[in-house]
């Protein structure tokens, strides 16, 4: 068949027919066994999920980037899914988590990668990028903006407590006490995931939205709504996948990310004043509650990230950016990757 005919035929094939197969395997990194999902061949892109999620949160991004000629890898992060989950919160500092991603790049035989992170994955991504600028050549942050650490300050958990009026608590404060939140969240994983995914999403009634500040006499599931109908972006089989994994593992691993914040703060004073220097794309939903309480970081992003390629807020989109608006995220992601060449 003539070369031109082959190219024309490829152009007419649907995306699914052109997309390499999604594969799963285990690798040893940084002292743990890590499960990864991977797709495609080419330059490496690593996708880092947040709380309470899994590699599965990138299910719409993996095939799009793979079809465009990238080797795309989405791990179950430390403490999640099929990856090892050490019990000690001290094993979940950002230094440990960044080390995991460095290990992924090495295990796959690469010297460089583009790193993307959503929610808790964003701090992992920008910490890894700041510590290893030789390895991570560009950064994509979803939901959580980068902020330059200032001089002085107090431990994160103390700062959270001081910001709250009497009788109120920040959700991350509620997560600090071992055994409390994990017992509540694990009581019915399917209901938990349904409520969390719905209540932090965009384009839902105001009264249904997640309250990240709540009474000291309340529990975290008191702050979210169990929907009568799922939003269009969320399918029953999606909830089933998450629920099956969390029913097996519990939520302790993910909660340990919050419980290690003070230790991370004490370990990373050397990053005071450090800006994020790599080319960076930031995407968030206009309805994302994180955009509300991280407004300072968002407003100063251009100063904190001198090579910010673009800052995009997607209308009608909430916290679960790449799940709620995969077409927009994939388009922006691919445009950004193209700009790096």
Identify the role of each PLM range.
Residues 10-17:
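Hydrophobic h-region of N-terminal signal peptides that target proteins for export
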Residues 51, 55-58, 120, 126, ...:
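Signature tryptophan residues that serve as conserved aromatic anchors
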Residues 23-29:
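Short acidic-hydrophobic surface loop/beta-edge motif
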Residues 308-341:
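Catalytic active-site module of serine/aspartate enzymes centered on a nucleophile-bearing elbow/loop
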Residues 1-6:
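Bacterial N-terminal signal peptides that target proteins for export
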Residues 50, 93, 324-325:
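Active-site helix-initiating loop/hinge in glycosyltransferases
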Residues 18-22, 33-34, 80-116, 120-309, ...:
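Flexible "cap/lid" subdomain of the alpha/beta-hydrolase fold that forms the substrate-access gate
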Residues 32-33, 38-84:
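Conserved HGGG/HGGXW glycine-rich cap/lid loop of the alpha/beta-hydrolase fold
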């Amino acid at each position: 068949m003539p070369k031109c005919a082959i190219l024309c035929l490829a152009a007419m094939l649907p995306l699914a027919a052109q997309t390499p197969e999604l594969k799963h395997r285990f690798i040893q990194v940084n002292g743990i066994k890590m499960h990864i999902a991977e797709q495609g061949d080419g330059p490496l892109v690593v996708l880092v999920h947040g709380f309470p999620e899994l590699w599965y949160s990138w299910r719409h991004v993996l095939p799009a980037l793979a079809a465009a000629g990238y080797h795309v890898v989405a791990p179950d992060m430390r403490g999640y899914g099929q990856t090892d989950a050490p019990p000690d919160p001290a094993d979940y500092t950002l230094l440990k988590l960044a080390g995991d991603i460095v290990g992924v790049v090495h295990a796959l035989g690469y010297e460089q990668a583009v790193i993307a992170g959503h929610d808790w994955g964003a701090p992992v991504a920008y910490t890894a990028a700041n510590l290893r600028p030789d390895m991570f050549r560009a950064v994509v942050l979803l939901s959580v903006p980068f902020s330059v650490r200032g001089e002085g300050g107090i431990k994160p958990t103390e700062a959270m407590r001081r910001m709250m009026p009497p009788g109120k608590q920040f959700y991350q404060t509620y997560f600090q006490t071992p055994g409390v939140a994990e017992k509540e969240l694990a009581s019915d994983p399917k209901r938990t995931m349904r409520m969390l995914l719905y209540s932090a999403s965009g384009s839902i009634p105001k009264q249904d939205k997640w309250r990240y500040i709540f009474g000291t006499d309340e529990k975290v599931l008191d702050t979210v709504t169990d929907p009568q109908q799922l939003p269009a972006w969320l399918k029953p089989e999606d909830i089933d996948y998450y629920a099956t994994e969390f029913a097996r593992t519990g939520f302790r691993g993910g909660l340990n990310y919050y419980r290690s914040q003070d230790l991370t703060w004490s370990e990373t004073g050397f990053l005071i004043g450090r800006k994020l220097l790599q080319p960076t794309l930031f995407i968030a939903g206009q309805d994302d509650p994180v955009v509300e309480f991280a407004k300072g970081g968002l407003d100063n992003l251009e100063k904190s990230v001198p090579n910010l390629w673009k800052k995009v807020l997607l209308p009608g989109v909430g916290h679960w950016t790449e799940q709620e608006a995969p077409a927009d995220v994939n388009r922006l992601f691919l445009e950004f990757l193209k700009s790096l060449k």
